[in-house]
């Protein structure tokens, strides 16, 4: 029997906003960090939560998502004040983040602004993207945090606005359900039933080949498009271009 200790930190951030073009974090700041410690699949209660003064205004669109006002942040610490405590908390752990590129991008950007030669997060933490995992488990389905809560029957009724600590706590429950195996049989059977039903009812129509040339997006273009939609959906709660 293995006695190895597995330490995971389920993490979420809220920010002043994001860029639609270029690096999504450039010129923006983290204003809230919420993190939940999980050791050997048990929530320990050793959480990390802080609000941060960004020294810039919160974009109206971002305020509409998380409801964190500029006035509320005026007396909060800046990132430099908490960075050492934060690094001590996450160092060596596996970070579980929904759409990890968003939060890791911001974290590495904030580290870089300090001019302290702090290395990239993925050099001292393993990073697991729960959104990527969900897409592998449920291809073609909605895999936002709210959608996963509904799928796994996890209560998210308190999530009227996005908040980093609440979202991290909810994601911890979702991730444990996704990786715990208790409900995997149900969803596997559900998917197999749907597949079999689909095979029985789909009628295939043979069409004559079209003379029109069809131009497909390259793999790089598709990846860039999906990455941008991920960012929109993570911070907006929904995405018009996804069903």
Swiss-Prot record:
A GO term, aspect molecular function: DNA-directed DNA polymerase activity
A biological process from GO: DNA replication proofreading
GO cellular component: cytosol
First-level EC class: transferase
Reactions performed catalytically: DNA(n) + a 2'-deoxyribonucleoside 5'-triphosphate = DNA(n+1) + diphosphate
Pfam name, any one: RNase_T
Record-listed substrate binding positions: 12, 14, 61, 66, 167
InterPro entries to which the protein is assigned, alphabetical: DnaQ (IPR006054), DnaQ_proteo (IPR006309), Exonuclease_RNaseT/DNA_pol3 (IPR013520), RNaseH-like_sf (IPR012337), RNaseH_sf (IPR036397)
Stored SUPFAM superfamilies: Ribonuclease H-like (SSF53098)
EC number(s) given by UniProt: 2.7.7.7
Binding residues annotated for a divalent metal cation 2, in chain numbering: 12
SMART domains registered for this protein in UniProt: EXOIII
Active-site residues, Swiss-Prot/TrEMBL: 162 (proton acceptor)
Cofactor note: Binds 2 divalent metal cations. Magnesium or manganese.
Keywords, alphabetical: DNA replication, DNA-directed DNA polymerase, Exonuclease, Hydrolase, Magnesium, Manganese, Metal-binding, Nuclease, Nucleotidyltransferase, Transferase
Cofactor(s) demanded: Mg(2+); Mn(2+)
UniProt-annotated binding residues for a divalent metal cation 1: 12, 14, 167
Known function: DNA polymerase III is a complex, multichain enzyme responsible for most of the replicative synthesis in bacteria. The epsilon subunit contains the editing function and is a proofreading 3'-5' exonuclease.
Subunit structure, as described in the record: The DNA polymerase holoenzyme is a complex that contains 10 different types of subunits. These subunits are organized into 3 functionally essential subassemblies: the pol III core, the beta sliding clamp processivity factor and the clamp-loading complex. The pol III core (subunits alpha,epsilon and theta) contains the polymerase and the 3'-5' exonuclease proofreading activities. The polymerase is tethered to the template via the sliding clamp processivity factor.
This protein's name: DNA polymerase III subunit epsilon
Lineage: Bacteria, Pseudomonadati, Pseudomonadota, Gammaproteobacteria, Enterobacterales
């Amino acid at each position: 029997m293995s006695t190895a200790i597995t330490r995971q930190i389920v993490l979420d951030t809220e920010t002043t906003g994001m860029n639609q073009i270029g690096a999504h974090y450039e010129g923006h700041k983290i204003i809230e960090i919420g993190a939940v410690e999980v050791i050997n699949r048990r929530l320990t209660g050793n959480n990390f939560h802080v609000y941060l003064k960004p020294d810039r205004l919160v974009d109206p669109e971002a305020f509409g998502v998380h409801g964190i006002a500029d006035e509320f942040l005026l007396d909060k610490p800046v990132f430099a004040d908490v960075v050492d405590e934060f690094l001590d908390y996450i160092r060596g752990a596996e970070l579980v983040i929904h759409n990890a590129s968003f939060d890791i991008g911001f974290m590495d950007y904030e580290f870089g602004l300090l001019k302290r030669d702090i290395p990239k997060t993925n050099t001292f933490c393993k990073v697991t993207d729960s959104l990527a995992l969900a897409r592998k488990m449920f291809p073609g389905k909605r895999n936002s945090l709210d959608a996963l809560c509904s799928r796994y029957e996890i209560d998210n009724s308190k999530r009227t606005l996005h908040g980093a600590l609440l979202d991290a706590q909810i994601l911890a429950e979702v991730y444990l359900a996704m990786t715990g195996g208790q409900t995997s049989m149900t969803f596997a059977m559900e998917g197999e039933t749907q597949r079999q039903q689909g095979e029985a009812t789909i009628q295939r129509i043979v069409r004559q080949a079209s003379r029109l040339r069809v131009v497909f997006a390259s793999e790089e273009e598709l990846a860039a498009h999906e990455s941008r939609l991920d960012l929109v959906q993570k911070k907006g709660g929904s995405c018009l271009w996804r069903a």
